[in-house]
């Protein structure tokens, strides 16, 4: 029991770091990246999109690794690589080294995807609660990230110091993971089956592939808002950096609050909840791009975070329950869907931002939210009607 509690604490604390000084650190700094390196919206969108693809490939690879060997080594490698690449970004003074190190930072964070199947196993029959709590910790990190950036800029006069903080925190957490994470024999055991078969077979299961499409769409909703809304507020409205970062903070507060509530209440989100949230999100977004009062903007940003906050953990828990094995491989497929969505939609918003303005490019977010609600409903219906056709390939 004590070992399980320690494992849960390590997993949740990592996802707090992931949101605070991992890729969650990037949205508040997009405008700073553009200004420091002379990067256009289009180029910045492509760089972030490619980073998302790198992250997804890393998450798929580490998912297969987890199904065979467990997650301790992969999560430890995440800590070291994040620390090294973050420190490198601090010293990068030209665009090419910066882009290379930013992609390495995405790669390192992608390896951390192994934490999802770890938590799914640790919480067993309470997977929905476990996923909501895990992503609530990520949300807390993302909530604090804009404050961290603002504090670093205020105290040092430069945004790069935030990456020094990132390197220090990941470096401190490395020994905690390496020496503290104790995997159960069941996770560490291997059978003589080819675990890659699980990934191939999953491609033929309609519920799984519909779920992957759902991750693609939800990423188009949440990542475009997190990445581009602060930039839009700074560049195309009368609001400044302080208001933009405060709006992002308010959004992350709603994003986190709903996950905490769902985790503590052990609540399961249904397709009806998702549909209502998608409609409310579209209305809140429409108002947020037109208001001039900062306090109304903050309220609308909070409401938007409240709407899309449950999307990722709810869909992941539903698929994990549908197929209760091979969760490492499934997590990799989720990562492929969500980060491919981030690549496509974040890049598209950047291109549209240069052509017609970010106000119109960001319309992608509410549209993706509505289509995601449809996909979630279809996934829910198919999961009730069908049994998974994938034979278990390893003891997970």
Which role fits each region the language model picked out?
Residues 101-137:
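Cytoplasmic helix-loop-helix junction between adjacent transmembrane helices
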Residues 38, 70, 91-96, 124, ...:
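Helix-breaking motifs and short loop linkers at transmembrane-helix boundaries and internal kinks
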Residues 269-315:
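C-terminal transmembrane helical hairpin of 12-TM major facilitator-type secondary transporters
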Residues 126, 133-182:
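Helix-loop-helix hairpin linking two adjacent transmembrane segments in secondary transporters
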Residues 2-28, 103, 205-221, 302-306:
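Pair of pore-lining "gating" transmembrane helices in MFS-fold secondary transporters
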Residues 57-95:
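Conserved MFS/SLC helix-loop-helix module at the cytosolic interface between two early adjacent transmembrane helices
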Residues 26-27, 206-252, 256:
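Extracytoplasmic gate region of multi-pass secondary transporters
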Residues 161-178, 362-380:
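Symmetry-related core transmembrane helices of the 12-TM Major Facilitator Superfamily/SLC fold
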């Amino acid at each position: 029991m004590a070992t399980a509690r320690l494992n849960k604490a390590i997993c949740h604390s990592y996802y707090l770091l992931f949101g605070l000084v991992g890729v969650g650190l990037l949205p508040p700094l997009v405008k700073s990246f553009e200004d420091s390196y002379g990067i256009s919206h289009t180029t910045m969108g492509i760089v972030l999109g490619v980073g998302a693809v790198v992250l997804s490939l890393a998450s798929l690879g580490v998912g297969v690794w987890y199904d065979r060997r467990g997650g301790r080594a992969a999560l430890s490698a995440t800590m070291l690589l994040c620390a090294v690449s973050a420190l490198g970004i601090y010293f990068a003074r030209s665009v090419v080294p910066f882009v290379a190190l930013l992609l390495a930072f995405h790669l390192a964070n992608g390896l951390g995807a192994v934490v999802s199947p770890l938590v799914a196993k640790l919480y067993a029959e309470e997977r929905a609660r476990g996923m909501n709590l895990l992503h609530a910790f990520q949300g807390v990190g993302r909530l604090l990230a804009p404050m961290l950036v603002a504090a670093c800029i205020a105290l040092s006069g430069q945004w790069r110091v935030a990456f020094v903080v990132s390197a220090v925190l990941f470096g401190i957490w490395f020994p905690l993971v390496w020496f503290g994470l104790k995997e159960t024999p069941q996770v560490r055991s291997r059978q003589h089956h080819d675990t890659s078969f699980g990934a191939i077979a999953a491609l033929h299961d309609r519920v799984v592939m519909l779920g992957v499409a759902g991750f693609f769409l939800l990423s188009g909703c949440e990542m475009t808002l997190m990445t581009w809304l602060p930039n839009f507020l700074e560049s195309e409205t009368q609001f400044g950096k302080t208001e933009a970062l405060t709006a992002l903070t308010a959004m992350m507060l709603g994003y986190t609050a709903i996950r905490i509530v769902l985790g503590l209440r052990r609540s399961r989100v249904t397709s009806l909840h998702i549909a209502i949230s998608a409609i409310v999100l579209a209305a809140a977004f429409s108002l947020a791009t037109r208001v001039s009062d900062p306090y109304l903007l903050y309220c609308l940003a909070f409401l938007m975070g409240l709407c899309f906050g449950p999307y990722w953990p709810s869909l992941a828990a539903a698929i994990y329950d549908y197929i209760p094995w091979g969760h490492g491989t499934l997590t990799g497929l989720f990562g492929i869907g969500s980060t491919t969505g981030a690549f496509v939609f974040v890049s598209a918003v950047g291109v549209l931002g240069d052509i017609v303005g970010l106000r119109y490019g960001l319309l992608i977010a509410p549209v993706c939210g509505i289509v995601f609600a449809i996909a979630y409903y279809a996934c829910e219906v198919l999961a009730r009607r069908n049994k998974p056709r994938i034979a278990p390939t390893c003891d997970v």
